[in-house]
Amino acid sequence: MPGEKDLCQYELWIIDIEKKTANRVPADKWTDQYIQVIQPGEKGDKLFFQRFKRTWDEVDICVVNTETLEVKELIHEVDKPYRDYHMQNTVILNDGKDILFRSERTGWGHYYHYDGEGRLKNVITSGPWVAGQVAAIDTVGRTIYLYGFGREKGVDPYYYMLYKASIDKEGVTLLTPENAQHGASFLSSKRYFVDTYSRVDMEPKIVLKNNQGKVIMELAKPDTRRLKELGWRAPERFTVKAADGLTDIYGIMWKPADFDSTKVYPIISNVYPGPFFEYVPT
């Protein structure tokens, strides 16, 4: 937190179990930096990691030779004013020959394809919307499946929508057009996935889809009749303008069980008051 004097210090060590040796990797660059391992190489001869500046607006993607401890900086990125840790994602493929890197360099979070030397090969996603977490990767078909936000008109921009994109060229295809929050679980072949989607005012639906987005079959659907018989009412979704008169703010409204439209009721505003975001599930 701001003002703290004693901060965690991160180090990276290479431990050889057979030789019974432990060596510290010379990965220091910034004071009070944060180090995170991405993954080892396929043969164990290298290790990919990322280091973040304390101000969380700069990041390096690096690789270290596990024998010589030589560190090579592959990608250096500056994201002002702040790098979104929850959305940041770096994927190493083909033993480091392909690197999928997420950046907000355009003002929107998107994915970029780099080679093993840190050279940009191509843009994967682009446009006035946000590419989020990776859901799955088909290494054979060189296809990435990812969540996106704010791309589809008329859909709450906070809803997770699933897209697929080629690793080697720009462009995405929407796989979940239903106006709801989606969660995808892929089968190992990546040919099919289970799509679970819902809203606060819509019961969950669970369907099996192919990797083209076609519904193969419905797997499960909850029975909410008893819940409604007991008097439960779904909340109402709404959108209002912020103080600037331009920005949409999305929320939900729970009305009393005995709501009377002819009466006046007090309003209780309930949001998460954290210093970094305010969020209401819709």
Predicted features by range, described:
Residues 50, 174, 181-282:
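Serine-hydrolase catalytic core recognition
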Residues 44, 57, 70, 86-87, ...:
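Extended, hydrophobic alpha-helical segments in both membrane/secreted and soluble proteins
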Residues 8, 32-34, 57-58, 86, ...:
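Short, small/polar residue-rich loop motifs at catalytic or cofactor-binding pockets
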Residues 158-161, 282:
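Beta-propeller blade termini and top-face loops
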Residues 11-13, 60-62, 110-112, 161-163, ...:
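A short loop-to-beta-strand structural motif that recurs across blades of beta-propeller domains
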Residues 2-6, 39-43, 48-55, 65, ...:
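Beta-strand C-termini and the immediately following turn/loop, strongest in propeller blades
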Residues 1-4, 15-35, 64-88, 114-140, ...:
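Multi-bladed beta-propeller domains
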Residues 14, 24, 39, 48-49, ...:
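Structured core elements
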